[in-house]
């Protein structure tokens, strides 16, 4: 087994997030729409107040995340974000700050992505991104180390066929609110035998062959990795899941320290890491489409675009 070389790579992301279900951004409320119609000086004053109230700060997540890099790019690309800063910490800290702001109906701008339970729990919206810094709709890809097809043809076939919908991932995350991810994944597999049968059709069982799946510490990826784990284990594999920073994920697969990953967000979020190691791994294509990243605000905030934010004084 290509067991991950922890000490040599030296970065471990052992976060335990509570992402349970995803959704898309909500439409503006009637009050928000009416306020926006006023336009003029009132709108300018409102956005200026919002920007100063949050001290020209975007509440971000982990420094190594792709969305963190994209937000840094936005701070450069948008002239009106001159003087703004991104405050990085952790996904859990961002979610706490978002919840506190909403409880007090205060302004906040966070880095967000979907699928994510925050859109189901709160009334949120993505800010429009006229410059396209955050890209459009994303997909999640499957990558494997070179030689996996020859070494583990059965696992390769299953991973190559693995494809599901955002609603499938959402159902696992929702179940994982009350039970652990492996049990939630087993529940999904039990309820979706036709889909699993398509992945495993004609695949011969193995006898305890070890395989390591590398993932990022988002619960979206914990969902896909655990479902793949259950399916591979049913075929006789001994599966290890290794959560790491995104850059390490690509390095692990490129260098053969991990066997496969169902976690890369493309074409924007993990583009830099993908390009750094391109050609050193095999890309099996999309396993989920319809993902998105961007700047997110509560719907009660009277702004709709990144360009509505005011430069720092």
Residue spans of the language-model regions?
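Short, glycine-/small- and polar/acidic-enriched structural segments
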Residues: 223-305
């Amino acid at each position: 087994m290509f067991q991950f070389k922890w000490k040599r790579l030296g970065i471990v992301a052992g976060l335990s997030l509570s992402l349970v279900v995803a959704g898309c951004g909500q439409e503006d409320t009637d009050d928000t729409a009416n306020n926006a119609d006023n336009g003029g000086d009132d709108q300018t004053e409102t956005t200026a107040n919002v920007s100063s109230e949050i001290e020209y700060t975007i509440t971000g997540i982990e420094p190594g995340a792709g969305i963190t890099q994209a937000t840094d790019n936005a701070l450069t690309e948008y002239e009106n974000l001159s003087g703004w800063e991104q405050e990085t910490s952790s996904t859990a800290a961002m979610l706490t700050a978002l919840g506190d702001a909403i409880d007090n109906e205060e302004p906040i701008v966070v880095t967000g992505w979907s699928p994510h339970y925050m859109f189901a729990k709160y009334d949120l919206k993505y800010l429009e991104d006229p410059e396209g810094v955050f890209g459009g709709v994303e997909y999640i890809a499957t990558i494997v180390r070179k030689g996996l097809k020859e070494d583990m043809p059965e696992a390769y076939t299953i991973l190559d066929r693995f494809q599901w919908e955002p609603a499938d991932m959402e159902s696992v995350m929702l179940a994982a609110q009350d039970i652990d991810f492996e049990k939630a994944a087993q529940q999904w597999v039990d309820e979706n035998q036709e889909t699993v049968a398509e992945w495993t059709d004609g695949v011969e069982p193995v006898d305890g062959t070890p395989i390591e799946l590398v993932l990022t510490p988002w619960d979206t990826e914990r969902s896909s990795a655990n479902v793949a784990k259950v399916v591979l284990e049913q075929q006789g594999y001994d599966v290890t899941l290794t959560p790491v920073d995104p850059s390490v994920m690509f390095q692990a697969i490129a260098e053969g320290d991990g066997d496969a990953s169902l976690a890369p967000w493309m074409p924007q979020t993990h583009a830099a890491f993908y390009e750094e190691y391109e050609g050193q791994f095999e890309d099996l294509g999309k396993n989920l489409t319809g993902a998105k990243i961007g700047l997110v605000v509560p719907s009660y905030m009277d702004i709709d675009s990144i360009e509505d934010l005011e430069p720092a004084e």
